[in-house]
Amino acid sequence: MYKVLISDAMSNVADQIFNDKGIEVDVITGLSEQELINIIPEYDGLLVRSATTVTADILAAATKLKAIARAGAGVDNIDCAKARENGVVVMNTPGGNTNATAEHAFALIMAALRKIPFADETTHKGEWQKKAIKGVELSKKTLGIVGFGNIGARLSHLVSGFDVNVLV
């Protein structure tokens, strides 16, 4: 039977998916590098998010490890070169958060343009500052997007309906 360690906090759906396939799962979060080095030899798989950094030292101790899965877009917290050298497959979920992140960025842009946080704060204090909360329209504005990967491209698409000039 395979054994997987989930070393970062995430939905319990993750361990349920493994359990449904007959894979034993341990969820142990908040491990130091040394603690992970001490227990990693017993695992065939490792599931991380952002809190765990998978170093060369951890991989050197991971004698049974076959795969590392990163529940997220990047793998900058995993020593991919050392993993490859050890025959460990590294996988991630590129695009998994693209739409949610682009929509969140769009919501923040709209909130800033329309002064929504300030309007919310002052009206909750019982104040009505009509002139101070007057926002501006997004239409006919220029939006600079730094980084035009999946998220930047999706954000560009979202603002396209607002007649925005996008600079990349």
Residue positions per predicted region:
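Rossmann-fold NAD(P)-dependent oxidoreductase module
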Residues: I17, H104, L108, R154, ...
